[in-house]
């Protein structure tokens, strides 16, 4: 399982950090959630700079996403990848559905 944390750094920019579940046992325990929503994005669909609206898991079920960060880097994630979105402030990030398939995600807002 691959989990990537998307968070706001002290520089006000969003950053990515790979989380190893073996080193983060809290990821392997039951976490309270508010529900689940399924979303679909057609290939090429782009969302300009934005923040995560709340702490949430975003799991790509189908297709691929490209996440853009303030340092100019682009990162691609495909089916089965889990993002823990925690960049609630600062510059935020961009997202684009890439590849030939639509992107289908399951978003699980966390209860804090």
Task: Please name every model-derived segment.
Residues 70-88:
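Short acidic-glycine-tyrosine-enriched beta hairpin
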Residues 1-40:
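A short, N-terminal "cap"/entry segment at the start of jelly-roll beta-barrel domains
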Residues 84-88, 94, 98-112:
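A short hydrophobic beta-strand segment most commonly corresponding to one strand
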Residues 25, 46-47, 64-68, 82:
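Short beta-strand segments in beta-sandwich/barrel cores
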Residues 2-3, 54, 73-76:
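Ubiquitin-like/PB1-type beta-grasp interaction modules and other compact soluble beta-rich domains
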Residues 21-24, 34-52, 87-90, 112:
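Conserved short histidine dyad/triad with adjacent acidic residue
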Residues 10, 61, 70:
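Short, ordered coil/turn segments that flank beta-strands lining enzyme active or ligand-binding pockets
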Residues 40-41, 50-67, 107-109:
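Short, conserved beta-strand element in jelly-roll/cupin
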């Amino acid at each position: 399982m691959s989990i990537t944390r998307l968070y706001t750094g002290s520089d006000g920019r969003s950053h990515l950090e790979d989380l190893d579940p073996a080193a983060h046992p809290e990821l392997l325990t039951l976490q309270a959630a508010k529900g689940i929503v399924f979303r679909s994005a057609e290939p090429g669909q782009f969302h300009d700079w934005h923040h995560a609206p709340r702490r949430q898991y975003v799991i790509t079920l189908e297709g691929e996403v490209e996440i853009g960060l303030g340092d100019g880097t682009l990162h691609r994630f495909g089916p089965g990848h889990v993002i823990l979105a925690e960049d609630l402030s600062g510059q935020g990030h961009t997202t684009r559905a890439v590849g030939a398939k639509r992107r289908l995600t399951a978003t699980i807002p966390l209860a804090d």
